[in-house]
């Protein structure tokens, strides 16, 4: 094999490498920027702009006269959990037994906001599984959920006695979240009185 043949082979390999290199760099840059975006797209990781701020103005209709409704003024005076839920929401069903336990324990006031649901479907769901809510309203168009910063149901907010949002939980509530985060925060808020 002559030096010319070796040089030609080497030149072909270099041309191929130079042709492929921009594509490798391009995909490397895409991956570099896409991975953090995908990791941050988990709503549980997104902070709530409402923490330590007053609850948004809330004045919604009742769930078709199912139960007494509430507005933002009703969130004053006592710590309250506000739970956004829907009858069509699978994770809402998962957390429902825990909401029933919270309601039975009377450890904290629990209000519900039914999100983008048919009133009759929501009433049937509550009749079937039990109704943990002291008061409940219907957010038929989802506007109030947007004001609260809801990414999807279920979401639960802890509101202090002054009407400020103190904690937000995305997804179904669990015993662990209740025992390790929510109730200690409720206790701390009560001790500040």
Where are these regions (language model features)?
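Thiol/disulfide oxidoreductase modules built on the thioredoxin-like
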Residues: 127-132, 139-190
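N-terminal targeting signals for export/organelle localization
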Residues: 1-61
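Hydrophobic beta-strand anchors of alpha/beta hydrolase catalytic cores
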Residues: 81-82, 110
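Aromatic-flanked redox-active Cys/Sec active sites in thiol-based oxidoreductases
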Residues: 83-88, 115
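Short gly/ser/thr-rich secondary-structure transition/capping motifs
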Residues: 40-41, 61-67, 136-139
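A short beta-strand-turn-helix
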Residues: 58-81
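Structural microenvironment flanking redox-active thiols in thiol-disulfide oxidoreductases
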Residues: 93-130, 140-146
């Amino acid at each position: 094999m002559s030096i010319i043949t070796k040089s030609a082979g080497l030149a072909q390999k270099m041309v191929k490498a130079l042709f492929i290199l921009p594509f490798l760099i391009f995909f490397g840059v895409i991956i570099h920027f896409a991975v953090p975006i995908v990791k941050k797209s988990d709503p549980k990781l997104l902070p709530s702009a409402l923490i330590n701020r007053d609850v948004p103005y809330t004045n919604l209709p009742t769930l078709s006269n199912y139960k007494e409704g509430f507005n933002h003024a009703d969130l004053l005076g006592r710590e309250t959990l506000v739970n956004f839920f829907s009858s069509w929401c699978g994770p809402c069903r998962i957390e429902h037994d825990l909401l029933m336990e919270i309601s039975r324990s009377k450890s904290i006031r629990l209000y519900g906001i039914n999100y983008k649901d048919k009133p009759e479907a929501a009433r049937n769901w509550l009749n079937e599984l039990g109704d943990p809510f002291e008061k409940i309203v219907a957010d038929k168009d989802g506007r109030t959920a947007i004001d609260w910063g809801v990414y999807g149901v279920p979401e639960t907010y802890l509101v202090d006695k002054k009407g400020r949002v103190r904690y937000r939980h995305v997804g179904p509530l669990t015993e662990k979240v209740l025992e390790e985060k929510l109730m200690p925060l409720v206790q701390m808020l009560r001790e500040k009185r």
